[in-house]
A protein has these predicted regions:
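Sec-dependent signal peptide cleavage junction
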Residues: 5-18
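Compositionally biased, intrinsically disordered or flexible polar/acidic segments
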Residues: 17-183
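Conserved beta-strand scaffold positions in the cores of enzyme catalytic domains, especially
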Residues: 22, 207-209, 314-317
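Serine-esterase "nucleophile elbow" of acetyl-processing enzymes
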Residues: 25, 139, 158-211, 226-239
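A recurrent domain-boundary module in secreted/ectodomain proteins
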Residues: 145-161, 359-380
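Structural motif
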Residues: 215-224
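Alpha-helical cap/lid subdomain in secreted, periplasmic
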Residues: 225-350, 354, 358-369, 373-376
Length: 380
């Protein structure tokens, strides 16, 4: 078995741990440069890594190649589960890259909160920054979609800084028109939060998109996504929040007054952390054109309550509903429809999500918020 451990060593046990790792999970062939980890490998202080409760892990095949050809499955899970993969790490800020096995939809949790929401598809890959302050990273794969497998094929850990604090961050809350789709760099369907990094100065900000499909304000507030944001958000960070599409669905039994108060609670929680909340109104449907060729959807998605809340709480507002309608009117019905998924007038495709992200970034730049660019970065 080949090991790849790169790191600096210090005198204390915690600081003696390597600060860079590459793990290949499962019982198949171990890829060159990776540490092979089987499901039955219990955490060991000498190795400094392993599963906390290997009796709740199994090895499983995966349909990919290389590190994606096998995986481990987490039989017990939740953000608070103790069924974690543990790695000793010196205090600092780390970049963690996760590759799933065969999974319909799964999330990544670490340090007791969500880190990545709803990765989809076999061998989906994503990464995140995480501060480690207690000498150990504790990570697992969790829901996701109930009744499906939660698997992990590979994990790469790289130390970014000795200081355990995330870079300035733009956090995003939202629904299926905002969230990430996978493969994240080439998905046909996309949310505008997924494409926003193209219009953000990466030397100033990282973007953490915590949006998820089907989400409502009550769910985002109480089901773990807001908890994850509040764990890390700090002065200098932004929190862009766009919800309302699913809240207006009768099956979710959310009145407009309730929606507004859930949104207010999130705004106030972010303010209390010293960060800047930003509200956004959802764009309309592709077909919201009148007979004169004007696109308008101002009465959709509890928009008026979002505008009123922004005024009451004195926070920035992106009226994406109106701004996107102006853009759609300028390009016409046919070109607008081409920015949405085939047969779907609600969800943007990658080109549509890119245009919505551009509109959001341009408006925030116009309002004087730093970190937003007016031009798309082609290398992202």
């Amino acid at each position: 078995m080949m090991l790849s451990i790169i790191g600096s060593f210090a005198t204390s046990p915690a600081e003696a741990a390597p600060s860079n790792y590459k793990f290949d999970f499962g019982n198949g062939q171990v890829e060159k440069g990776y540490i092979g980890v089987s499901a039955d490998e219990k955490y060991d202080e000498k190795k400094r890594y392993g599963f906390n409760t290997p009796e709740n892990m199994i090895n499983v095949p995966a349909s990919g190649t290389g590190v994606g050809s096998d995986a481990v499955e987490f039989l017990k899970f939740s953000t608070k589960s103790e069924n974690t993969f543990n790695v000793d790490l010196p205090k600092g800020l780390y970049e963690v890259k996760v590759t799933l096995g065969d999974t319909a939809r799964a999330s990544v949790a670490a340090e007791g909160v969500y880190q990545v929401i709803n990765m989809t598809g076999n061998n989906a890959t994503d990464s995140f920054q995480i501060p480690v302050t207690d000498g150990q990273l504790n990570l697992l794969i969790t829901e996701g979609k109930v009744g499906t497998r939660f698997t992990l094929s590979a994990l790469e850990i790289d130390k970014l800084s000795h200081h355990p604090e995330t870079n300035r961050t733009i956090y995003i809350g939202g629904d299926s028109t905002v969230c990430n789709y996978y493969p994240i760099d080439s998905s046909i369907q996309a949310g505008w939060g997924q494409l926003l990094p193209k219009f953000v100065d990466s030397e100033i900000f990282q973007v953490r998109n915590m949006a998820s499909g089907g989400q409502i304000a009550r769910g985002f507030l109480y089901d773990g996504q807001m908890e994850a944001i509040l764990k890390y958000i700090k002065p200098g960070d932004y929190y862009i929040l766009q919800l309302g599409i699913n809240d207006t669905n009768p099956k979710n039994t959310t009145t407009e007054a309730q929606f507004k108060e859930y949104m207010r609670e999130m705004v106030q929680q972010v303010k209390a952390k010293g960060a800047t909340p930003i509200l956004s109104t959802p764009q309309g449907r592709a077909t919201d054109f009148n007979t004169e060729g004007v696109h308008s959807s101002v009465n959709r998605w509890y928009r008026n309550s979002v505008i009123a809340l922004a005024q009451e709480e004195n926070v920035p507002l992106v009226d994406l509903n109106v701004l996107s309608s102006a853009y759609f009117t300028s390009i016409g019905p046919a070109a607008t429809l081409a920015l949405y998924m085939n047969g779907d007038t609600l969800h943007p495709n990658r080109a549509g999500a890119t245009e919505l992200a551009r509109i959001v970034a341009e408006e925030l730049k116009r309002q004087g918020l730093d970190g937003f660019t007016g031009e798309e970065k082609k290398n992202q």
